[in-house]
Amino acid sequence: MYLTSEKKEEIFSKHGKGKNDTGSAEGQIALFTHRIAHLSEHLKTNRKDYNTERSLVMLVGKRRSLLDYLMKKDIIRYRAIVKELGLRK
C-alpha cells in the first residue's frame, strides 16, 4: 500500500493538531492532497484506468468541499493551508 499508517501520522502531525488528529479539516485536506498527487502519478502511466480517474475526481470534490467549509468557518486557517500545500484558490 502506498500510504502506510506512519505516513498518515506524519501528514496529520505536520498539518493537524497532532499525529492522532484525523478529524481536523487541515489534516483531511492534506491527506486528500497526498492521495490526489499519488493518483495523478498513476494516471500518467495508466491513461485508460477510468475507475481511478473517477476516484480522483471524487477526491478533488471532497477536498474542495472541505476547503469551502474551512473558508466559511475560518479564513485565516484556510489561507494558511492553501499556502502550505501550494493549492490554487
Swiss-Prot record:
Residues 1-24 are annotated as: Disordered. Disulfide bonds: none annotated. GO terms for cellular component: cytosolic small ribosomal subunit. One of its GO terms (biological process) is translation. Keywords: Ribonucleoprotein, Ribosomal protein, RNA-binding, rRNA-binding. Residues 1-13 have a biased composition (Basic and acidic residues). Pfam families: Ribosomal_S15 (PF00312). SUPFAM superfamilies: S15/NS1 RNA-binding domain (SSF47060). PROSITE patterns: RIBOSOMAL_S15. InterPro entries: Ribosomal_uS15, Ribosomal_uS15_bac-type, uS15_NS1_RNA-bd_sf. One of the primary rRNA binding proteins, it binds directly to 16S rRNA where it helps nucleate assembly of the platform of the 30S subunit by binding and bridging several RNA helices of the 16S rRNA. Forms an intersubunit bridge (bridge B4) with the 23S rRNA of the 50S subunit in the ribosome. Belongs to the universal ribosomal protein uS15 family. PANTHER family: RIBOSOMAL PROTEIN S15, BACTERIAL AND ORGANELLAR, SMALL RIBOSOMAL SUBUNIT PROTEIN US15M. This is Small ribosomal subunit protein uS15. It comes from Christiangramia forsetii (strain DSM 17595 / CGMCC 1.15422 / KT0803) (Gramella forsetii). The lineage of its organism: Bacteria, Pseudomonadati, Bacteroidota, Flavobacteriia, Flavobacteriales.
